Curated annotation (Swiss-Prot):
Residues 758-815 are annotated as: 8 X 7 AA approximate tandem repeats of G-S-[QR]-T-P-X-[YQ], motif CTR1. It comes from Danio rerio. Residues 759-790, 866-888 have a biased composition (Polar residues). Belongs to the SPT5 family. This is Transcription elongation factor SPT5. GO terms for cellular component: DSIF complex; nucleus. The gene is supt5h. Gene3D superfamilies: 2.30.30.30, NusG, N-terminal domain (3.30.70.940). Residues 312-419 are annotated as: Interaction with RNA polymerase II. Interacts with SUPT4H1 to form the DSIF complex. DSIF interacts with RNA polymerase II and with the positive transcription elongation factor b complex (P-TEFb complex), which is composed of CDK9 and cyclin-T. One of its GO terms (biological process) is negative regulation of transcription elongation by RNA polymerase II.
């Protein structure tokens, strides 16, 4: 201090001492004379006596705390969260001693304060009188800055701060350190107990453990803390403990500043919001569900909305709660029921009103009967509360703000937020509501965002419930939860609580909550969650119906069926359809159409549209059009309503139709009759009929670059350019699909040039109606007789009956197979020229390529050689089985000439299996058998030793070839008409006479067997389709098309005109004229 300050301080001290002495003298002299002085002394004396009495009570009850007694008026009992146990306040432990020291000096302290007040007021008056501003400011600085409030009130505040500091000493460098030791997860507590037992066991030995403590916090998994001075002490303690084997070689010391955090217990304050759910811990409403109405954080209370439990028996007895419980020995909790004011009044209870609430026994009830009551925060369970669906139904139909989808989840976890770094969010609660920003990091429920505001440049931290996702129009997002989970799309509209997005896959508008969206750049894969199905996949709905998946949802599919209707089905209700990439159909111009072809719709509801074929099923095609919004651009139409882009009408196929029915399969025409009946030339074609024409592999430059049309096979009707060609095959680049394929040259026709002709046409004058096979395209469904066209002349009778042997053994091979080495043809040709040897395997074709059947020379000697063919029993002419392969068997009734057993000779027909036609039926669809001339075939072999003998004019055909009479019921030999749900009649040919002529309904078809429900006997029997015939429908009957291109379609028969009927189809409501034989009557 300076000299002036020292002098001022000494003057002040002298003034204070003199003033104190004067005050004491005045009090002693004027103790009875001054009323004011006596009153003041009495008040001071009473204060001192009260404090002394209070201290005496404290000394008597030192063994129990007096915290609540002293501070009961300032602390709320309800706000004490940890009411299960009470701790002494550390401040009180240190402060009681200090207060005891100060109580003896209270009187002196009061005198000092009075002296200071008197001296200060006197000096203040002098300063005001002299008007010295500097001195006045210095006075106030000294008065209010010289001591703190605590020092002025308690005095000796230095001792108090020292004692408090002693209670909060932090660990230093001289204290033991904490070491983290890796432990087996889940065994932390048990490991700490085992170390404690080990410490006790070694305590009285020569080598006690040097560790001080072991800590296993609940929130730390996989580690424990060991307190010791050195790391070697820790290793010695954990040696031999199995759970600590993994941490024996590596222990890490905890920094000194972080040691206190290991034992710090921070009680998480539950942030309850209105409309959230809690359960009661105890009391009458224990475990009852309740909804938060409002929260009072200052009073630590919470108001709940719940279903009351009112004991009506007690109200009826007019007893108080205390008397009622005293009377009833066993407590019985009343059931939950909503408050009914009328019922309470009827039992004698008093109900009053307070605004919108009803008051009964000091409790508030709403108009709907719910109880609103306040509870302490410690009386409720706030974590993991999930109301069940039954509780929600009792509580309310759908409480406000509750997401039933979330509530019904079986998991006990709280619904976690789905916020991620990079999401755009906005604040929905608190002071910064509507503030937008971008998430920088996510740490549990703490979200750090960078606000998008010009005045806010620093990151801000928010709890997750105060944020919600924010999207702008044009954002590309992905649905991460809810009904449309996994779908992606573009946001087209943003509402207050939901977002409208346009799906990338299905092109539908989806309405989704913002919390279920996430910004993304990729597009949905279109595969369901299980990976079993994908968008646009062909699935089987039932045995007769297929469809295409047009929308994938979490639990269901939306399927566009073949009839154009969209159905919603569950995942388990559909089966994946076998891949039909190679399916073929015919368009309106008889062009072949395949999957991935570009076609145009010329008829039906989608007329004028263009699209790409995705699937073909029977006569239906599923197409995809990028310009169509509905169903993701998928639509279905009939194949005959399409026209192939770039295609042209192929050769006429009218001679293959019956009654206007065009075969849907492209394999109905014979592959060996290009251009209408000519035989193919020698080369690679022929399907291996005679084993000839393998080709040398030389390039044919003349054909390269020419535009050709494919005339046969699965690509029939396609036009393309030849890129490469050899003697047998050509590589053709198709115009429509831009793909290059290999095609047999025999199946190509140059556009603009003449079609290839055979050697000679052997077609008859008129197409034989009776000999057309297969009937109604049955051949195209089984490969055995698929490509047979009129094999031989069946309309002539008698069948070569009057001919006699025209040629002897010396004839030239003009009418026989010229390249057959087994025939004694003269002159003979060398084998190497035609690559045909005697040791070749016999071909299934009965003759050489392009030749006619070659009879044996009558004079040819019999040579004992193994017979190639098995015994062949030709069909009796009266046998009804002609073309139906299911009915063929070696017939028991031989022809009048007897069974055909040719003499052993090297000549053979090379038939592997007998043909039901009886004459050289080949299995190869490419082989060609022209109609034989009358002189080339000896039709009536007999057991004569000289080979063949002429047939008598009246003898039947040995091959059993019995052509149908034109106009006969041609569909009776086929079972293609069989389908489900139609009414049939059992024919007389069935063995069981009890069901003959009964009518029934076909329930299912398996192969050639039908399960028929007989209406008369009400039983189900299995009958072969050959013993059934369809019931002819009558007017106004509901019918089903059983034959033709509209097969399986249904409709109503409006009228009958002769053998035709007018039908209104159900699918497109069109009127069609169909033959009655093409219709089956549906079940009534």
């Amino acid at each position: 201090m300076s000299d002036s300050e020292d002098s001022d301080f000494s003057d002040n001290q002298s003034e204070r001492s003199s003033e104190a002495e004067e005050v004491e003298e005045n009090e002693e002299e004027e103790e009875q004379g001054s009323v004011a002085g006596s009153d003041k002394a009495e008040e001071e004396g009473e204060d001192l006596e009260d404090e002394e009495e209070y201290d005496e009570e404290e000394e008597e009850d030192d063994d129990r705390p007096r915290k609540k007694a002293r501070h009961g008026g300032f602390i709320l009992d309800e706000a004490d969260v940890d009411d299960e146990y009470e701790d002494e306040d550390p401040w009180e432990d240190g402060a009681e001693d200090i207060l005891e020291k100060e109580e003896a000096e209270v009187s002196n302290l009061d005198h000092v304060v009075l002296d200071e007040d008197h001296s200060g007021s006197r000096r203040l008056q002098n300063l005001w009188r002299d008007s010295r501003e500097e001195a006045l400011g210095e006075y106030y600085m000294r008065k209010y800055a010289k001591s703190s409030g605590g020092e002025h009130f308690y005095g000796g505040s230095e001792d108090l701060s020292d004692d408090i500091t002693q209670q909060q000493l932090l660990p230093g460098v001289k204290d033991p350190n904490l070491w983290t030791v890796k432990c087996k997860i889940g065994e932390e507590r048990a490991t700490a107990i085992s170390l404690m037992r080990k410490f006790v066991a070694y305590q009285c030995t020569d080598t006690p453990l040097q560790i001080k403590s072991v800590v296993a916090p609940e929130h730390v998994k996989g580690y424990i803390y060991v307190e010791a001075y050195k790391q070697t002490h820790v290793k010695a303690a954990i040696e031999g403990v199995g759970n600590l084997r993994m941490g024996f070689w590596n222990q890490q010391m905890v920094p000194i500043k972080e040691m206190t955090d290991v034992l710090k217990v921070v009680k998480e304050v539950t942030n309850l919001k209105p409309k959230s759910w809690v359960r009661l811990k105890r009391g009458l409403y224990k475990d009852d569900i309740a909804q938060v109405d409002y929260v009072e954080p200052s009073q630590n209370t919470i108001s709940l909305k719940m279903i009351p439990r009112i004991d009506l028996d007690r109200i009826k007895a007019r007893m108080s709660m205390k008397d009622w419980f005293a009377k009833r020995k066993k407590f019985k909790r009343p059931p939950q029921r909503l408050f009914d004011a009328e019922k309470i009044r009827s039992l004698g209870g008093e109900v009053s009103h307070d605004g919108d609430f009803m008051i009964f026994e000091a409790n508030r009830y709403s108009r709907k009967g719910f109880l609103f009551k306040s509870f302490a925060m410690s009386a409720v369970i706030t974590e993991g509360v999930k109301p069940t669906l039954s509780e929600l139904e009792k509580f309310e139909d759908q409480p406000e703000g509750i997401d039933l989808e979330v509530v019904t989840e079986t998991t006990g976890k709280e619904r976690e937020h789905n916020l991620q770094a990079g999401d755009n969010v906005e604040v929905c609660e608190g002071e910064l509501i509507n503030l937008q920003g971008k998430i920088l990091s996510v740490d549990g429920n703490k979200i750090t965002i960078m606000p998008k505001h010009e005045d806010l440049k620093d990151p801000l931290e928010f709890p997750a419930h105060e944020l919600r996702k924010y999207f702008r129009m044009g954002d590309h997002v992905k649905v991460i939860a809810g009904r449309y989970e996994g779908d992606t799309g573009l946001i087209v509209r943003v509402e207050e609580n939901f977002v409208i997005l346009f799906s990338d896959l299905t092109m539908h508008e989806l309405k989704v909550l913002p919390r279920d969206l996430q910004l993304c750049s990729e597009t949905a894969s279109g595969v369901d969650a299980g990976g079993q199905h994908e968008w646009g996949e062909l699935v089987q709905l039932d045995p007769q119906t297929v469809g295409v998946i047009v929308r994938l949802e979490r639990e269901t599919f939306q399927v566009l069926n073949m009839h154009g209707k969209v159905l919603t089905v569950r995942h388990q209700a559909v089966n994946r359809r076998k891949d039909n990439r190679f399916a073929v159909a015919l368009d309106s111009e008889q062009n072949n159409i395949h999957v991935k072809d570009i076609v145009k719709v010329i008829d039906g509801p989608h007329s004028g549209r263009e699209g790409e074929i995705r699937h073909i099923f029977r006569g239906f095609a599923f197409l995809h059009c990028k310009k169509l919004v509905e169903n993701g651009g998928m639509f279905v139409c009939k194949a005959r309503h399409l026209v192939l882009a770039g295609g042209s009408k192929p050769r006429d196929v009218t001679n293959f139709t019956v009654g206007g029915f065009a075969p849907m399969s492209p394999r109905i025409s014979s592959p060996m009759h290009p251009g209408g009946g000519g035989q193919p030339q020698r080369g690679g074609g022929g399907g291996g009929g005679g084993g000839m024409g393998r080709g040398r592999g030389r390039r044919d430059n003349d054909l390269i670059g020419q535009t050709v049309r494919i005339s046969q096979g699965p690509y029939k009707g396609y036009i393309g350019v030849v890129k490469d060609a050899t003697e047998s095959t050509a590589r053709v680049e198709l115009h429509s699909t831009c793909q290059t394929i290999s095609v047999d040259r025999q199946r190509l026709t140059t556009v603009g040039g003449k079609e290839r002709q055979g050697r000679s046409s052997t077609h008859l004058r008129t197409p034989m109606y009776g000999s057309q096979t297969p009937i109604y395209g049955t051949g195209s469904r089984t490969p055995m007789y698929g490509s047979q066209t009129p094999l031989h002349d069946g309309s002539r009778t008698p069948h070569y009956g009057s001919q006699t042997p025209l040629h002897d053994g010396s004839r030239t091979p003009g009418q026989s197979g010229a390249w057959d080495p087994n025939n004694p043809n003269t002159p003979s040709r060398p084998d190497d020229e035609y690559e045909f040897a005697y040791d070749d395997e016999p071909s299934p074709s009965p003759q050489g390529y392009g030749g006619t059947p070659n009879p044996q020379t009558p004079g040819y000697p019999e040579v004992p050689s193994p017979q190639v063919n098995p015994q062949y029993n030709p069909q009796t002419p009266g046998t009804p089985a002609m073309y139906n392969t299911d009915q063929y068997s070696p017939y028991a009734a031989p022809s009048p000439q007897g069974s055909y057993q040719p003499s052993p000779s090297p000549q053979s027909y090379h038939q592997v299996a007998p043909s039901p036609v009886g004459y050289q039926n080949t299995h190869s669809p490419a082989s060609y058998h022209p109609t034989p001339s009358p002189m080339a075939y000896q039709a009536s072999p007999s057991p004569s030793p000289v080979g063949y003998s002429p047939m008598t004019p009246g003898a039947p055909s040995p091959g059993g070839y019995n052509p149908h009479t034109p106009g006969s019921n041609i569909d009776q030999a086929s079972n293609d008409w069989v389908t489900t749900d139609i009414m049939v009649r059992v024919k007389d040919t069935f063995l069981d006479g009890g069901v003959i002529n009964q009518t029934g309904i076909i329930r299912s078809v398996t192969g050639g067997m039908c399960s028929v429900f007989l209406q008369d006997t009400e039983k189900v029997v299995s009958i072969s389709s050959e013993h059934l015939e369809p019931v002819t429908p009558t007017k106004n009957n509901k019918v089903k098309v059983i034959l033709g291109e509209d097969r399986e379609a249904t409709g109503v028969l409006l009228s009958i005109d002769g053998e035709d009927g007018i039908v209104r189809m159900e699918l497109d409501e069109q009127l069609k004229i169909l033959n009655l034989r093409f219709l089956g009557k549906l079940e009534v």
